A protein has these predicted regions:
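Phosphate/pyrophosphate-binding active-site segments
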Residues: 5-7, 19-21, 44, 49, ...
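Short beta-strand segments
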Residues: 7-9, 55-57, 113-115, 137
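Glycine-rich beta-alpha junction loops
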Residues: 8-14, 58-60, 85, 140
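Aromatic-enriched
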Residues: 10-34, 175-178
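Short acidic, glycine/serine/threonine-rich loops at helix termini
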Residues: 15-20, 63-69, 89-93, 122-126, ...
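Short beta-strand elements at the ligand-binding edges of bilobed clamshell
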Residues: 27-33, 90-101, 145-159
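Anionic-ligand anchoring segments at beta-strand to alpha-helix junctions in alpha/beta enzyme folds, i.e.
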Residues: 34, 41-108
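Phosphate/diphosphate-binding loops
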Residues: 98-143
Length: 182
């Protein structure tokens, strides 16, 4: 699940083949299997948090509904990096810009990183000792690449986010002081 560039010479574009050699047929590796224990652990940590933040990247583009539900149930601001813009409506009270997110970053206690490398936040904004990071990504090489998260979940978001929402259902907590800060 990384970006891939394939270069095909122009003289090959219109070449006809009768049969594709079997040794050229790719065999995709099977995807990660959702670890429900990690999801439960993440739900518990998020429910106990006082100042959660959600960070989204391009990997979360098709999961706007789930991200918005998580944001509302946690009263958590959402910071969108690069390809994560548009996942949450920019006019939402819980949508924050990068400069505002930078200010909130130092105060948050739990970060839920969804489909993002979380590179800018971790490398430029820093990590405080009290901050716990939950990182959900399909690419296991991205999880812990910069900093070891409290919980690293290697999973398809189509499996992880509904499961996380189910585990958090009925435990929504409005964080009035945190929302006012946003």
């Amino acid at each position: 699940p990384r970006p891939v560039g394939v270069e095909i010479p122009v003289n090959i574009w219109n070449t006809k083949v009768d049969k594709i050699p079997q040794d050229l047929v790719g065999h995709p590796k099977s995807g990660p299997i959702l670890n429900t224990d990690q999801i439960e652990e993440a739900a518990t940590l998020l429910n106990k948090s006082h100042k959660p933040i959600i960070i989204v990247g391009g990997g979360a583009q098709n999961f706007s509904v789930e991200v918005n539900q998580l944001s509302k149930s946690l009263s958590a601001p959402v910071i969108a990096f690069r390809n994560g813009h548009g996942i949450i409506d920019g006019s939402s009270q819980l949508s924050v810009t990068l400069p505002a997110g930078r200010e909130l970053w130092g105060e948050c206690d739990v970060v839920l990183a969804i489909g993002t490398r979380c590179q800018t936040a971790q490398m430029q904004w820093g990590i405080d000792d009290h901050m716990k990071i939950i990182h959900i990504d399909i690419d296991d090489e991205e999880i812990g690449r910069i900093n070891t998260p409290e919980i690293g979940i290697n999973a398809y978001l189509k499996d992880a986010l509904p499961s996380l929402l189910d585990n958090m259902s009925g435990k929504e907590k409005y964080r009035n002081d945190w929302v006012k800060k946003v």
